[in-house]
Amino acid sequence: EEPLTAAPVEPVATIFADTNRDGRVNDLDAEDKTDWSAERGAIILANIGDTAGRCAGPDDDSLSDDELEACNDASDDLPHAPDYFAPVRTLSVSGLSDDAFGTVAAVGVGYENIRIFIRREEGWEYFTRDMQLSAEELSTGLTFGVDSRDIIRSEDIWNGVTTLEFTVTDGADVLTDRVTMRVAPVVIHNHLERANEVYVPQSDLPVHREFVEDLSGALTEAGFTAPLARFDTIDNWAQDFVEFGYMSMPAPDGEAKIIRVAIRSPQPTRSAGRSLFALKGPGFGVVQTGGDNYHQADSFGNLETIPPYELDGASYPAGRVIYGDAGDGYAPHSDFTNFFDAQWVQEPVVLDTSWLIIAHVDEFVQFLPADNAYGWTIAIKDVPAAFEVLREAQAAGHGEAQVFSHPEAPQMTIDELLADE
């Protein structure tokens, strides 16, 4: 640990966190430590992995989906994963009487989500709200570790910001200092990032097995050597029931502490989502996003990520999420929209998808790497061009031909389709 400035002669309560986000706690964190912005302010991780493998998996039918989600490294008061603690330190307090005592606690909305541990010689000890620090302890300066029991789900509930309050009481004298922290946002991956794992469902459908074989071959040609990871579900649409993201917190020397997150689509009756709980492990959590039943607009096929960019003076270093809204009856559930609004770092772009039956943005827009100033380009479905192909076929005398060759597709001719306004 780096030394902090020596304590003044007169008693002063001082608490620091990694406000400047350099992965260390020292005097450089003193400025604006009670403020929090996109550029400055201490970060906490929602410690939702399963380091010891103590949580049950999706095959345990005695547990509900909510119970499976509830088990993680922060679901009790033990330090299961201290590597993901945010460092907090108090400056030594001198000039106190032997009867003086101190407290450290999270205050304000959401305080119950914050866990605080104190580092003792024998290891980390959970520090409850009613525990007191002795005058002797206060005189030495102390180290704490802080994490969160949960992610940020909705600003209407909690925006993830918390205040740690350090209070020293010596008779009638009360000294107080504060530092502001916020739970790390869940950031969605974009298509410029290098893949290190590729997931596919385990399906018995011949057409899906063929797809998996083709995908495996394409990955091999691209130089991807890791084996395909499997979801234990026959739901073919992995893109629809899960989106992957991560939370990160600065560590020393430019490194970062990262917890990966599998985000279940807000379709609680879509059973495939339960299979995600098998992924939970060290530094890997699974979260549910609420929702109601199984509505297509809440599929994560209706979610993409614009890669990082700058435009008109605005910067989006983590990119932006993009989803579709088809209006009454086909709009995403409020749990869906609230979740992505609450993260703050990937300001959503909303597109009109009312012209689509399924109303998913991934049906007509994708973002691809490109050799240009942005490093990416947009692939957009050209619907007018498709109609022009049909009109040309009609003009060439093929109006009676079937539009679709698949036997389960709508049976209509080119003439019928073009006449349907």
Predicted regions, residues:
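Histidine/cysteine-enriched polar flanking segments
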Residues: 1-421
